[in-house]
Amino acid sequence: MPTVEETQQQCRLALTDPTLAAIASALERRGPGLDQCVTYVADVTERPETVQPLAAIKADLERDGLDLADAQFERYLLTAAALRSLARLDQVPVTDCVRALCCDLYAKLPQRRPRLDLTHHSFAELSKVATLRRFPAGQFDWEPSGLPRSWLLKIRPVGALCQTLHVIAMRMRRFGPAFFVHTGVSGKNYLLLQREAERSYYRMAHSMALQPRVIGLITSSWLHSPDTFAISPHLAWLNRIFRENGAVLATMGPADPGCGVLHRSPERKRAYEEGRLKPTLGLVIWPRDEMLAWARTRPDLEH
């Protein structure tokens, strides 16, 4: 994987490409300028309104006749934002392995990506990585977050709610910050592999050890729901590591069928159409001490 210095060189070189350099010239000529655009990128989340300032700028550039096909505008902004983040990457409390994964992803930002557009969820995900609000760990990423209090009302069964409240009160002592896990933004995760998942958690644990205030790992997805495993038992390993190492497992009510649970799975799609699958969200809460204790037993995941 490239070093920080090598990645900086690659990003700078990419930004001199004539098609991307034309965007820079247009931004400086018309305003608001690149610095303001990078500030907008740092504010992008999954909420549609957060990309509106960038969408307005892009529309202005296109009206002026600039060709922005193949997500040139998006790739330019992400690369420019990543270049600024590289200057402070060494100060971020994550392991060298995670820094290397950041560099690897940053170096690929200028490349064409399918479906990359301001309105596509991948732009929000990559914006977070490019501005150090989300971190790659291999098969999975994480971002600093916490446990929303509103989720407590959704937790089922009641025993899991009681266990969650006990863990928060006695073990975590607060609702955040925590590492919230997502499937990786790198685009290589159509096939989930147990060892790669464990390697991701191992990398997260070692970065968590560098951040004393982080209370643990949290994730919520159809991937962790027992209703998913009833139709796709080959995925049950996804929760095994948590169940065997001190995590709280629960469900949180219905999942949107469009969340991905039916994607690339004829079995789950058929079960849904026949009424045998009612998608639900699984919830995982893995306290810090238990996660770090598990990581200490798995030095085999270092490489």
Language-model features: locations:
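Non-catalytic substrate-recognition and accessory regions of acyl/acetyltransferase enzymes
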Residues: 2-189, 209-216, 230-303
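Short acidic, S/G/P-rich loop/turn micro-motifs used as interaction or catalytic elements
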Residues: 185-194, 223-227
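Conserved acetyl-CoA-binding loop-helix of GNAT-fold acetyltransferases
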Residues: 189-208, 217
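Acidic/histidine-rich, metal-coordinating catalytic segments
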Residues: 215-225
